[in-house]
Amino acid sequence: MGSCKPKKKQAPCFLRRRHLRRLNVCKRDTSKTYRRRRHVRRLPKKRRRRC
């Protein structure tokens, strides 16, 4: 239950980055926080850019 599993069809990084909140694809703390509560803290730009 820790990290979300990658989807079968993975969008290009820019796409994933753009809809990060909706797709919940990133294997970072975002995925965990996303499930717990709707409101997710935005990560700093450097971290957010990495998919």
UniProtKB/Swiss-Prot annotation:
UniProt keywords, alphabetically: Chromosome, Developmental protein, Differentiation, DNA condensation, DNA-binding, Nucleosome core, Nucleus, Spermatogenesis
Keyword DNA-binding: yes
Biased composition (Basic residues): 33-51
Gene Ontology CC terms: nucleosome; nucleus
GO molecular function: DNA binding
Primary residence: nucleus
Protein name (Swiss-Prot/TrEMBL): Protamine-Z1
UniProt source species: Scyliorhinus canicula (Small-spotted catshark)
